[in-house]
UniProtKB/Swiss-Prot annotation:
Disulfide bridge map: none
Region (Disordered): 1-29, 117-138
Free-text function comment from the UniProt entry: Located on the platform of the 30S subunit, it bridges several disparate RNA helices of the 16S rRNA. Forms part of the Shine-Dalgarno cleft in the 70S ribosome.
GO cellular component: ribonucleoprotein complex; ribosome
Naturally occurring in which organism (per UniProt): Mycobacterium marinum (strain ATCC BAA-535 / M)
Annotated keywords: Ribonucleoprotein, Ribosomal protein, RNA-binding, rRNA-binding
PANTHER family per record: 40S RIBOSOMAL PROTEIN S14/30S RIBOSOMAL PROTEIN S11 (PTHR11759)
Subunit structure of this chain's protein: Part of the 30S ribosomal subunit. Interacts with proteins S7 and S18. Binds to IF-3.
Protein name: Small ribosomal subunit protein uS11
Origin: domain of life: Bacteria
Family membership: Belongs to the universal ribosomal protein uS11 family.
Amino acid composition bias (Basic residues), ranges on this chain: 13-22
Family annotation (NCBIfam families): PRK05309.1, uS11_bact
Amino acid sequence: MPPKKASGTGPKKGQKTRRREKKNVPHGAAHIKSTFNNTIVTITDPQGNVIAWASSGHVGFKGSRKSTPFAAQLAAENAARKAQEHGVRKVDVFVKGPGSGRETAIRSLQAAGLEVGAISDVTPQPHNGVRPPKRRRV
């Protein structure tokens, strides 16, 4: 009897594995989505294809620590390091959301060695959209 293969390891039968190819993109865009609970940093090429990403949760923080500026800093550094492997040197930054990690993430992108060009806030503004949640009583 042949030995059993562990379930969930490797590609399924008839499925091609996608090797991660090294893209050479000198200029890209960094999208920072900072919510009250998490910060997600995505670095894309000019067409919008994702080159690298990282989030506070992906870096290893859980619960309320994901929303801290330090977690956003580590996420931005992680994404910048991955993007630099693909040749990214200059980024335009697009910030979205009201979270606490906005400025910290931009600063850590600069500290990681990426040259930051334009910084723009693309937070969506409702034209009286959905009803907001009720006020907290603490």
